[in-house]
């Protein structure tokens, strides 16, 4: 899972100024020490100025695979954001986006990261982080053109600030994508249908599967976080092994041993990546040795929501060892999982460069941030969004809570009131319809009426505030 490494880098980069020791520990891949440096923040529950420390503590918990503790930490950090509804909304998207990505819930992650990148209340670093998260999601789904778009937008934002840390991270991601996709799309792994059928972006092709090496745009002599440097060296070794270079074997085995310190998720993923590289380089003895190291505890992680690479390796190794029946069985499981993912996860995933968010996307990122009880309220809103008389009082009554409780729950989890959520969904739905040439939306008022907005003045005022243009301008784009 690529998200582990880049979540760590994003966390460290965001905390550099307020928590430099924590950031340095994360950059050194010492997640235990990073947690120890911010653990004391968990007891300071009422201090709003301690928000950054609590957020770092939650990040460190997630890096250490303490998911329940991390989720509680994220909730606490959001409760401490009292100075800005904008920041509460953005941070809520950020926290839920990373959790969703690390759980392989790509549609929800993409929705959250898109919101984060597009939100006018986000800082430029938060927008870059959102775009990086979106690029990771698209890559995991084999949508490399869309991933390139997100990275291009992230680079433009970071270039404008000359931030070397973010620029180096973006360079590393580009190299990562080139190496990982280059290996999976090699001629010796033709049965890896999920990747062989993926779209390959121009940036990836220009890097020739990572054979051009890692060329960061950061000036020579500038200190580079150890986590970035080690990852680049590891990717270079993977590329060499995939090209049949046996001199890469021992350094890669050493990297495997080091990965044990970074948690079972990353260890499992590293082993699978080494197996794929060895198979691509026809180094079957290495592939077999590393595959056999994947113990039962790690295959529990192998049964995560989506893990095509592991399932493919299992089928490929069975075939390599002469177990034709086992290979067919495992390959069937692999294909079923790949198709199921494409059918369920790609529906709401969209390019960062697309003109507008679609209303249907809201059901992912908002519901992902709400508790189960209030997700019922949100579903009720979606089902009745076209009704102009829909009120928050009615929504609250539907789930048997007070209107005040509904307001507080939405504000703390999403950073918006229920009425703001309703208004945003309606305006996004209107905009989506206006941009849909198949609908031929000649009458703006009729289009707005379908989404529950009857007042022309309310439509124009709200639409311009949200999209910085009038509805008529959208039609004539």
Curated annotation (Swiss-Prot):
GO terms for MF: DNA-binding transcription factor activity; sequence-specific DNA binding
Lineage top rank: taxon: Bacteria
DNA-binding region, residues: 393-414, 444-467
UniProt keyword list: Activator, DNA-binding, Hypersensitive response elicitation, Plasmid, Transcription, Transcription regulation
Annotated ranges, domain HTH araC/xylS-type: 375-477
Coiled-coil portions: none
GO biological process, one term: positive regulation of DNA-templated transcription
Pfam families: HTH_18
Record function comment: Positive regulation of hypersensitive response genes involved in plant pathogenicity and partly of its own synthesis in minimal medium.
PANTHER family: HTH-TYPE DNA-BINDING TRANSCRIPTIONAL ACTIVATOR EUTR, HTH-TYPE TRANSCRIPTIONAL ACTIVATOR RHAS-RELATED
Protein name as it appears in the record: Regulatory protein HrpB
Source species of the chain: Ralstonia nicotianae (strain ATCC BAA-1114 / GMI1000)
């Amino acid at each position: 899972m690529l998200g582990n490494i880049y979540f760590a880098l994003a966390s460290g980069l965001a905390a550099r100024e307020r928590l430099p020791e924590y950031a340095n520990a994360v950059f050194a891949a010492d997640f235990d020490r990073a947690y120890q440096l911010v653990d004391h923040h968990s007891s300071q529950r009422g201090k709003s100025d301690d928000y950054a420390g609590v957020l770092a503590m939650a990040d460190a918990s997630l890096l250490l695979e303490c998911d329940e503790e991390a989720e509680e930490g994220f909730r606490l950090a959001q409760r401490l954001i009292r100075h800005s509804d904008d920041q509460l909304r953005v941070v809520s998207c950020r926290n839920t986006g990373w959790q969703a990505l690390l759980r392989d819930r790509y549609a929800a992650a993409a929705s959250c990261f898109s919101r984060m990148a597009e939100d006018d209340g986000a800082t430029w670093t938060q927008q870059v982080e959102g775009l990086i998260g979106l690029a990771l999601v698209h890559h995991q789904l084999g949508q490399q053109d869309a991933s390139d778009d997100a990275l291009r937008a992230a680079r433009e934002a970071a270039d404008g600030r000359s931030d070397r840390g973010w620029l180096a991270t973006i360079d590393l991601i580009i190299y990562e994508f080139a190496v990982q996709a280059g290996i999976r799309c090699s001629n010796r792994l033709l049965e890896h249908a999920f990747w062989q059928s993926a779209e390959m972006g121009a940036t990836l092709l220009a890097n020739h599967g990572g054979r051009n090496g890692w060329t960061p745009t950061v000036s020579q002599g500038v200190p580079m976080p150890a986590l970035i440097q080690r990852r680049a060296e590891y990717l270079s070794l993977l590329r060499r092994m995939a090209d049949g270079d046996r001199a890469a074997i021992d350094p890669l085995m050493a990297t495997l041993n080091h990965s044990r310190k970074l948690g079972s998720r990353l260890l499992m993923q590293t082993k699978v990546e080494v197996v794929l590289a060895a198979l691509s380089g026809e180094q079957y003895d290495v592939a077999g040795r590393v595959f056999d190291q994947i113990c039962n505890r790690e295959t529990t992680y192998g049964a995560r929501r989506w893990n095509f690479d592991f399932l493919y390796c299992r089928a490929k190794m069975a075939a390599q060892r002469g177990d034709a029946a086992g290979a067919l069985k495992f390959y069937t499981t692999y294909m079923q999982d790949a198709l199921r993912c494409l059918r369920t996860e790609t529906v709401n995933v969209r390019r960062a460069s697309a003109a507008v968010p679609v209303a249907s996307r809201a059901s992912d990122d908002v519901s992902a941030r709400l508790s189960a009880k209030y997700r019922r309220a949100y579903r009720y809103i979606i089902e009745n969004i076209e009704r102009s008389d829909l009120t928050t009082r009615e929504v609250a009554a539907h789930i048997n809570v007070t209107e005040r409780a509904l307001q507080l729950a939405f504000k703390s989890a999403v950073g918006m009131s229920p009425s703001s959520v309703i208004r945003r969904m309606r305006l996004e739905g209107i905009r989506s319809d206006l941009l849909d040439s198949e609908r031929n939306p000649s009458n703006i008022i009729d289009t707005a009426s379908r989404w529950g907005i009857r007042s022309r003045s309310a439509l124009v005022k709200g639409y311009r505030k949200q999209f910085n243009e009038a509805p008529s301008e959208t039609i004539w784009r």
